[in-house]
Amino acid sequence: MSSWNPGSPAGLPATQPATQPSGPTAAYDALLKQHVDARGMVDYRALHRSPKSLKRYVDGLAAVDLDALPRDGKLATLINAYNAFTLQLIVEHWPVDSIMDIPEDKRWEHRRWDLGGRKYSLNEIEHQVIRKRFDEPRIHFVLVCAAVGCPPLRREAYVDDRLDAQLADQTRYVHDHETWYRFDRRRGVLHLTKLYDWYAGDFEQAAGSVWKYVAPRVDGVETAGPKPDIRWIDYDWRLNDVNNGPEG
């Protein structure tokens, strides 16, 4: 299993200094370092006990001018916003065992999140803003819907000049961890996260097919013989809490 460093700019040369988040993003970055463990799981109990920093960041997103940001700055801000809004949702409904325990009308379709002076639902941010405006299938490995089956939450905020390295790091990790990827070489079966099923169109647009997108990203699949059968891993909707989740 390859290493994953969710708190450093993986993929950048060691000689290149890491850009530190500034302003409100710095406070969000500090919050993640404090409340997210090495597996990308969240200490919701502690976050619920000390909610002011998260609430301050979430409220501050109302003043963000997305149009003034460069492409990667805009995408980094949107990813941070989606993940922070989701954290806030869980904190407000704590304790819960799963995001699915939250009433449906309060979950992904609730248009309550102020981003740049406009109210969005979580689904609108993901599908109408991020997916519609950015040709970037790797966003499915960074948007965290508070479930164990989601990608891990990084212990740092996303920032514009390290965004590509952060996306690459998340993608590598997902394709090297059995929660999201398993290859049974003997049976010729490739088990993939349901994210590839739900968002197949995004991966097909990028590479022609899900298989063509996956194959270069995992060791040994392309040289293992005929194209394997693809099967979907059951999505784990348990809360991505420190008491749940994959082993480190």
Where on the chain are the PLM-derived regions?
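Interaction/scaffold regions that mediate signaling and macromolecular assembly across diverse proteins
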Residues: 2-248
